[in-house]
Amino acid sequence: MKSSQSDYKKRGMLDMNLCNQLQEASYTELIDTLQSSHADWRTACIHLLSKKYNTHPQFTDVLLQQLVKEKALYTKIEIQTQLSQYGQISKMCQYLGCIGDNQYRAIPLRGSKKKSYPLPRDLIARSLAHMEVQRFQDFFVELPQLSYSQLLEAIDAFGFLCFYHQSLVNKETYEYIKTCILNYWDDDLMLWKLMTCLSAFPMAIDLLQELQTQQKHPTILMEVERSLKLLIN
């Protein structure tokens, strides 16, 4: 059934007319309006905060705290989009694995059969995955400091970025993934995600072929074979 204009408003679809009404609002006024019960007003506030006040010291905190409690679909999408562009990466990383319940908690029975790289399920990882390549190094230096649950989601963003931006594929990023494989060899969920990461690295063919002979877990083995197929074909 086709959604009505009212449905889109309730879900927080960005309305440029509202943005125009709020164009002259101060930072404090936008923060106050962000508490509105109307999702489309909240989306307009996020949009304008990002355009006008993205260098404010509390900008990233405001967006992250709103994302934690936000229910409206399009408002959440707007927050994620603006975090990708302007969010402080170190602060974003602290929220990895904390928002929503769509993350993998255990290795699935079957992996993806697609030729594309899987979109991260964690909302913050998804924002990180879509940031500009120029911001990658700021993300990369955060990885060693992350907790296990944070790294579990960060790896999805890392692989996504490397897969779609081959300029990020180099000895340093490849060695990092190999180190993770050694460190998490007995962790099926992390290892499965790392096998997906290897699909971004053309130099990983020999390693994947070796892993193909060693790996016994059926889902991990399927991911090894999927990555190999993508690299060879």
Identify the function of each model-found stretch:
Residues 2-22, 40-55, 65, 74-87, ...:
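Structural detector for internal amphipathic alpha-helices that build alpha-solenoid repeat scaffolds
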